[in-house]
Curated annotation (Swiss-Prot):
It is found in: Nucleus; Cytoplasm; Midbody; Chromosome, Telomere. The modification Phosphoserine is found at residue 157. Its main location: nucleus. Residues 135-195 are annotated as: Disordered. One of its GO terms (molecular function) is histone binding. It holds the Pfam family FHA. This is E3 ubiquitin-protein ligase RNF8. Its EC number is 2.3.2.27. It comes from Rattus norvegicus. The gene is Rnf8. Residues 184-193 have a biased composition (Basic and acidic residues). The FHA domain specifically recognizes and binds ATM-phosphorylated MDC1 and phosphorylated HERC2. This domain is also required for proper recruitment to DNA damage sites after UV irradiation, ionizing radiation, or treatment with an alkylating agent. Homodimer. Forms a E2-E3 ubiquitin ligase complex composed of the RNF8 homodimer and a E2 heterodimer of UBE2N and UBE2V2. Interacts with class III E2s, including UBE2E1, UBE2E2, and UBE2E3 and with UBE2N. Interacts with RXRA. Interacts (via FHA domain) with phosphorylated HERC2 (via C-terminus). Interacts with PIWIL1; leading to sequester RNF8 in the cytoplasm. Interacts with WRAP53/TCAB1.
Length: 487
């Protein structure tokens, strides 16, 4: 068979296009045009704008970017989104490009609590342009004019909001997602700022959902939310933006974090009491464990302080933005209730700072108590070690004074006891009796001699714990005396 015509092959390739097919739907597919950069998110400056009907904050403003590398292969990059980008069920590291191939599975965001799959799931395909046309989602060019008037009325510029530091990879999700007990981060504040640009009539359902989620936010958040609801203006006017929801959400999450911090403090206090009861035994294992607990407690304290300080700084920035927004509203609409709400939020902020200071002092007290307990345990260990050394020293004195032969001044070797109850080395007393048949100590006549196995065994056991020089010297003496005895 002949080779295919290059011109025909090029025409076939030109009629085909890469696309992200949305799973479970025959529409809202995202076309990847060759030579272009495709951006996806909920903002206005992206190629494809995704607005979630269930959880508006699931998709970040500029969630991800798809473009071709120098080899012409398509890549996807997570643009530091809050809920992440998943390629074949694995979360991508932010700001790193990953190559995609035909058949790959792409997921934007995370599944909601009541569902198994995420709202936006796609499959990478390559099809004819004509067959793709009915299924493609419209590009953001069609929605630019629609939201143009709305963007001009916003008091917070999108550039200023986008400059807030975005979080890296995290398991944090929106209030309806699984594992939503973690505190909200700056990305959630962006979403609240967008929601604030809508009329108050549209904000009422959101406030109702916040009331429903009060139960899991802790007692501090439950007491804060009704106060904020009372401060909302009774008269609803079109296009009255407010960032109070973002402040409320940040307060709730910060208070929840403070409750966890207090619980951990109570647990550490109980642990200190238990250690005090058991520290009298003074084992080295306890010393090591207490040192490790102390280091863990210090690192936890520093981490909690850093997180709380970051949230306080973000809260102060939000308050500054709300104050600027409030000034604009007073000039246009004259609503003084928002100013009262800001003052109340500042009072809550001061209370939060006081609570943080109290928590810090409590942690410092716990650390000081652990330091004192550790010092006492070390002192007890030193005392036990000193007692052991004293016993060993006393044992050496006994060996030197009571278990030495008076003739050779060495520890008994094959000890024998005479009829006068004095003990000597068997070799030494035999040599002595060649000159005199009387005890070298009491001068009584030697009538009998008895081997003392008890003394031999006792001396052998004690010599095993002495230095190697002493053991070597004793072995040499035993060999020499046995050799002389054979002669």
């Amino acid at each position: 068979m002949g080779e295919p015509d290059p011109l025909v092959s090029g025409q076939l390739a030109a009629r085909r296009s890469w696309c992200l097919r949305r799973l479970g739907m025959d529409r809202e597919w995202l076309q990847l045009e060759a030579g272009s950069e495709v951006t996806i998110g909920r903002g206005f400056s992206v190629t494809y704008q995704l607005i979630s009907k269930v959880c508006p904050l699931m998709i970040s403003r500029n969630h991800c970017v798809l473009k071709q590398n120098p080899e012409g292969q398509w890549t996807i990059m997570d643009n530091k989104s809050l809920n992440g980008v998943w390629l074949n069920r694995e979360r991508l590291a932010p700001l790193q490009g990953y190559c995609i191939r035909k058949g790959d599975h792409i997921q934007l965001g995370v599944p909601l609590e009541s569902k198994e799959h995420a709202e936006y799931e796609y499959e990478v395909i390559e099809e004819d342009r004509e067959s793709l046309a009915p299924c493609l989602a419209p590009k953001n060019d069609h929605t630019t004019e629609k939201h143009k008037g709305l963007r001009t009325k916003r008091k917070f510029s999108s550039d200023g909001v986008e400059s807030l530091p975005a979080e890296g990879p995290s398991d944090l999700r929106c209030p309806l997602a699984k594992g939503s007990s973690k505190p909200a981060e700056p990305e959630k504040l962006h979403g609240k700022g967008e929601a604030a640009s809508q009329p108050l009539g549209c904000l009422c359902p959101t406030l109702a959902s916040l009331e429903a989620s009060e139960r899991t936010a802790g007692p501090h958040a439950c007491s804060t939310l009704p106060k904020v609801l009372e401060l909302y203006p009774k008269k609803q006017k079109a296009c009255s933006p407010s960032a109070s929801q973002s402040s409320l959400e940040l307060f709730k999450m910060t208070m929840s974090r403070m409750l966890k911090l207090k619980t951990q403090m109570q647990e550490k206090q109980i642990a200190v009491l238990n250690v005090k009861r058991q520290a009298r035994k003074g084992s080295s294992k306890k010393v090591v464990r207490m040192e490790k607990e102390l280091r863990d407690l210090q690192s936890q304290l520093y981490a909690e302080q850093a997180q709380q300080q970051a949230r306080v700084e973000q809260l102060e920035k939000t308050f500054q933005e709300e104050e600027q927004h409030l000034q604009g509203l007073e000039k246009e609409q004259g609503e003084c209730d928002l100013k009262q709400q800001l003052l109340q939020a500042l009072q809550e902020h001061r209370a939060l700072m006081e609570e943080l200071d109290r928590s810090k002092k409590d942690f410092e007290k716990i650390i000081q108590a652990k330091n004192k307990e550790l010092e006492r345990t070390k002192e007890e260990k030193d005392k036990v070690q000193a007692q052991k050394e004293e016993v060993l020293s006393h044992m050496n004195d006994v060996l030197e004074n009571e278990l030495q032969c008076i003739i050779c001044s060495e520890y008994f070797i094959e000890a024998v006891t005479l009829n006068c109850a004095h003990s000597f080395c068997s070799f030494c007393i035999s040599e002595w009796m060649k000159r005199k048949v009387e005890c070298p100590i009491c001068r009584k006549d030697i009538e009998s001699r008895t081997n003392s196995l008890v003394l031999d065994n006792c001396i052998s056991k004690m010599v095993e714990r002495l230095s190697s020089d002493v053991k070597e010297r004793r072995s040499v003496l035993i060999r020499e005396r046995r050799a002389k005895r054979l002669l």
